[in-house]
Amino acid sequence: MQASPTARRLVFASSMGIFGDVQDRDPPLRVDTPVSPTNEYGRHKLACEEAIRQSQLQWSILRLTGAPPIRLIGYSFDPRILFAFSRNARFEFIHPADAGTAFARAVACQEAIGKILNIGGGEKCRTTHHAFCNEMMSAMGIGPLPAAAFVRTEVRRFFGDWLDTEESQRLLQYQKRGLGELKVDMREELGAVAPLIRLLRPVITWFVVRGSPYLRENRRVGSS
């Protein structure tokens, strides 16, 4: 890009993953909070950030929180991922449309050049991992997920945390939607499939919960 006479502007999608998956700091995470990636994804994002900051491009780095998919039909995921994080871990999401707005507006924002910005939904989008999972299950017509299905840890585990998005919101004015809008949009995307999901709710919920590798042990310990 540096050799191109025209392609000089770069808005890079980084991730909260660069902060690692241990919530051992007081929220919210700020742009200058020390990073500590704990997996290859986070380390790769951090390496990209470092290379971009050393370049001569007109760059902006947007560190994005979780943006749940609106269209779930055909979306493949491993249920075990849901349970690998502490149920009481802090989580801030963002509606995908708001995330798109942030990136689109960053392209033309002169004040954003040379800056790292946290991109999240704001205070109205702050919750816990377990609560958010159950809200998403509810939007699909299944669940809820039992607390015993989630890993138990001494320190909260989740990638990222609640975020300081004051500067990004001031520059980009993108935080418009919250949990209500997210659930409405998800239900609309389900369309005619929704009644079938509700009919099969017990079976689907059972299938998701059985993917937890922690459920049996947590219930054993809880009953002992």
Provide a role label for each language-model segment.
Residues 1-38, 62:
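Conserved Rossmann-fold NAD(P)-dependent oxidoreductase catalytic core, especially the SDR/UDP-sugar
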Residues 9-12, 60-66, 92, 118:
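Structural signature of the Rossmann-like NAD(P)-dependent dehydrogenase/reductase core
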Residues 27-46, 89-97:
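Short-chain dehydrogenase/reductase
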Residues 31-34, 67, 71-87, 138-149:
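A short C-terminal helix-loop "cap" of Rossmann-like NAD(P)-dependent dehydrogenase/epimerase domains
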Residues 49-71:
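Conserved beta-loop-beta element that borders a ligand/cofactor-binding pocket
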Residues 65-71, 85-97, 121-125:
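Glycine-rich "substrate-gating" loop/helix at the edge of Rossmann-like oxidoreductase active sites
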Residues 84-108, 114-115:
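Substrate-positioning beta->alpha
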Residues 102-171, 177-185, 193-201, 207-224:
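Mid/C-terminal beta-alpha module of Rossmann-like enzyme folds, strongest
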